[in-house]
Amino acid sequence: MKFNKAKSMLACAITLALSTHAAVAAEQAKEKKVERIVVSGTPAGVGIRKIDASYAVTNIDSSQIIKLSPKSTADLFKAVPGVWVESSGGESGANVFVRGFPGGGDAPFLTLSIEGSPVYPAPTLSFLENSSLFRIDETIETMEALRGGPNPVLSNGQPGLTTNFRLKRGGEDTQGLFKYTTSDYDLQRVDAVVSGEITDDLYFMVGGYVKSSPGIRDAGFTSEKGSQFTINITKELDNGELNFYTRQTDDHGAWYLPTPLNVNGIDAEYTQLGTLNRQATIFTGPNAQAHDIDLGDGRGWDGHVSGGSIKLEFDNGWQFIDRLLVYFLVSTFGMQSG
């Protein structure tokens, strides 16, 4: 009887503890519950509640991005309903398909935007689709994916999928994050981000990453290397705000289209490109101009994107919002079977 009484007391104690924990968890969940606001698909990017949007839009915030752990920008789009993604030849040059729109490759029905401005208007150019010109890191606050709806009017005439990446912004409290990532294929990556207040009503966010790797399929040299640095400055005004951001990216990775692997004497985990076979010289134009090509440079994005916006509110509900974006050099090399 004593044994049974002890078990009953233990059961009561456990039940009480679980009930208390459940109550605390419910209270915390209630405190953390916030309404999702979307800006994609609205005139001038004016935020509305997601529940009030009359079109299909997906929100993925920074915490969800960490959980999904995408291997590339295009890989993140797998979380969007109605979107199918394949990596094709590597981190760059993915194929992105949108439900209801026919396509044979690349990403003809995808537009990638940053802070509401399209990064690059051409949806496909020699395997150089939109996601090849953008890298995800800890400076991203959220990604919004708008399928159809007002896309043709409020995007760059895109009837399919428009994805909008919004950068983190500074606040009154200074905070930061440092992250180191490694893998069984010798990936070495360091991410960092810091945000805070410079002076009254002037806020900053800076961050980026540095990485290197011989690749999942060992190339015999550092075939995947890159870095990125982002600055975002926001000035709050009495009747609006000013925002400016710039992002410098130099990130390239090996790009292999399908090659024979199930062949005697060939190691599928190692590429035969090596350091001696990756050099080539090609001749173009009527004057046979020579170009030295190094396949080790891979495919990627070498350049920078800068942009900004001004938002002003006036009497009687009038608003003025303007955005700008500029981008520069793209260089890319890859090995294609043929």
At which residue positions do the language-model features occur?
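Structural signature of outer-membrane beta-barrel domains
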Residues: A44, S92, V119, K168, ...
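Transmembrane beta-barrel wall of Gram-negative outer-membrane proteins
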Residues: Q175-L273, G298-G317
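Cleavable N-terminal targeting peptides that direct proteins into the secretory/outer-membrane pathway or into
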Residues: M1-K30
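Acidic, small-polar-rich N-terminal luminal/periplasmic segments of exported/outer-membrane proteins
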Residues: K30-D173
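Extracytoplasmic loops and strand-loop junctions of Gram-negative outer membrane beta-barrel proteins
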Residues: L125-F127, A145-L146, T174-L177, S212-I216, ...
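Long, low-complexity, polar and repeat-rich extracellular regions
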Residues: L16, E27-Q28, K32, Y203-M205, ...
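Short, flexible loop/turn elements at secondary-structure junctions
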Residues: F3-K5, L16, P102, T182-D184, ...
